[in-house]
C-alpha cells in the first residue's frame, strides 16, 4: 500500500495534536510530553493505519476544537483520570474498543517480549500509577466526532473483512521507524534489549 498521499495530512494532524498535547495541565502530564518526537512517532504509526477519509475527519475535529478553544488532549487525559464526565455516548465507541482490545490482546500473545512495555489491557488493571489500554482508548475515542468514529469503524470493518489487524499494522509501522524489518525481528531484539515502550 502506498501511504505517501497520506503523509502531509498526517503531519498536519501531528502538529495540531502536539500543540494541544504540550499544553495539557501539569497534573495530567504524560511522560512523553518530555519527548515530543516519541509522541509523534507513536501517533504517526497509528495514523498510517487510517484511511484518508478518517484522517481528514479527525483533522476537522482538531481544527474545530482549536477554533473553539478546546484542547482534545486535555479532555482525553481528564477522562482517563476520571476527572470529567463522559464526553460522548456513541455506541460505536464500545464496538471499536471491543475490536481493538482483541487485536491488542493478540499482539500480547504473539509478541510478548516486544509488548512487555505496553499498557495493561483491561480497565480492571487501572491504578493511580498506570492507565490501561482499554481506559486510554475509550478516553481518546470520546474526543472524536461521530463522523470520525463512523469513518474509523469503517476502516476497522474493512480490515476485519481482509483478515488484517490494524493494531498489528500500527506496531509494524512503529518497529520499522526504529529500524527493524518486521515485528518478528523486533520481538527477537526485545529479548536482549527490552521492549519498545508504548
Predicted regions, residues:
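A cross-kingdom feature marking solvent-exposed beta-strand/loop segments within repeated
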Residues: 26-49, 60-61, 72-73, 132-141, ...
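Short, structured motif recognition centered on aromatic/hydrophobic residues
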Residues: 47-63, 96, 141-144, 148-156
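ADP-ribosyltransferase catalytic core
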Residues: 60-70, 155-159, 163-164
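Surface-exposed, interaction-prone regions used to assemble/regulate multi-protein complexes
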Residues: 64, 75, 83, 114, ...
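Short amphipathic alpha-helical linker/capping segments at the junctions of internal repeats
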Residues: 69-84, 166-179
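Conserved binding-pocket/active-site segment within a compact domain
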Residues: 109-161
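Alpha-helical oligomerization segments
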Residues: 150, 154-198
